[in-house]
A protein has these predicted regions:
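Hydrophobic structural segments
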Residues: 1-96
Length: 96
């Protein structure tokens, strides 16, 4: 039977909901990078993140500023960054 090594990253919001969504996204990605690298070093093949891992869960109000958190797939900022890191690690990432 083949062995599959999986990992899960879950963390609290970095920053504050008064910040712009792109700033929150950048802080959250920055906070995840060491864990991605650690998972790769441990041979993780499938790495899962929590839902909406780059923003507050769910947007904390009806403020239109949260519309800016939406990203295009597959050419959005987060997708491109994750492809770069995951490609180096030869792993797979589940983005929800």
């Amino acid at each position: 039977m083949a062995k599959l090594t999986c990992g899960l990253i879950q963390m609290g919001l970095k920053g504050d909901t008064s910040m712009a969504p792109d700033r929150i996204r950048d802080l959250m990605i920055e906070a995840h990078i060491p864990y991605i690298e650690q998972a790769a070093a441990k041979g993780v093949q499938v790495l899962c993140f929590q839902e909406v891992f780059t923003q507050p869960y769910f947007c904390p109000g009806q403020d239109r500023k949260w519309y800016a958190a939406a990203e295009r797939i597959p050419d959005g900022h987060t997708t491109r960054l994750m492809q770069e890191y995951v490609g180096q690690a030869k792993a797979r990432v589940q983005l929800a």
